[in-house]
From Swiss-Prot:
Coiled coil: none
Organism: Staphylococcus saprophyticus subsp. saprophyticus (strain ATCC 15305 / DSM 20229 / NCIMB 8711 / NCTC 7292 / S-41)
GO biological processes: regulation of DNA-templated transcription
Protein known as: Heme response regulator HssR
GO molecular function: phosphorelay response regulator activity; transcription cis-regulatory region binding
Start and end residues of each Response regulatory domain: 3-116
CDD domains attached to this UniProt entry: REC_OmpR, trans_reg_C
Membrane-crossing residue ranges in chain numbering: none
Amino acid sequence: MTTCLIVDDDPKILEYVSKYIEREHFETIVQSSAENALSYLETHQVDIAIVDVMMGKMSGFELCKILKEDFDIPVIMLTARDALSDKEQAYLTGTDDYVTKPFEVKELMFRIKAVLKRYNVNINNEVSIGNLTLNQSYLEIQSSSKSMNLPNKEFQLLFLLASNPRQVFNRDALIEKIWGFDYEGDERTVDVHIKRLRKRLEKIDASVTIHTVRGLGYKVDDHV
């Protein structure tokens, strides 16, 4: 799943942008400051960053420079400042695109996809493993002879595992990616969803299985 980091000190912008992008089947990570964003990136990877210019101690210009030089992440800047000098500064710091507020989030989505295409980031809504094809737009899994629609969280969980075959994910990583970093429920919800997915996979195609790696987490294997 394509991951988009959104950095803005306005909670309304964070909610507005993240909700729309998630409907396009992207994973979103929201941070309210440049410092928090950099702390997150010390242990996580993202595919693109949407960065507001005017923030607290560290400006969006400074953050963009670091993201480009140290992390090589595509960046789109958001700002209410539309002076030519501001645009020049943004591009000099390395931004890939520049969007002025107020903006249509649909247009922002077009720009995100265009930038990702230039970086050859796969934003395909389908992934195949074994004899199965997972279609993210319809929350559907298909084999050669059967198809099945899954509940959203179950599908996203399977899609993540299938997109990274044989990679082991622990519960914390799965919860953060599927339920969000602010999830406060029982971590055993992962086990419940995995159990349901195993039963569904048995019905549609036994060649794809979810394995428990004792003490580590879960991974998907295919036996084709």
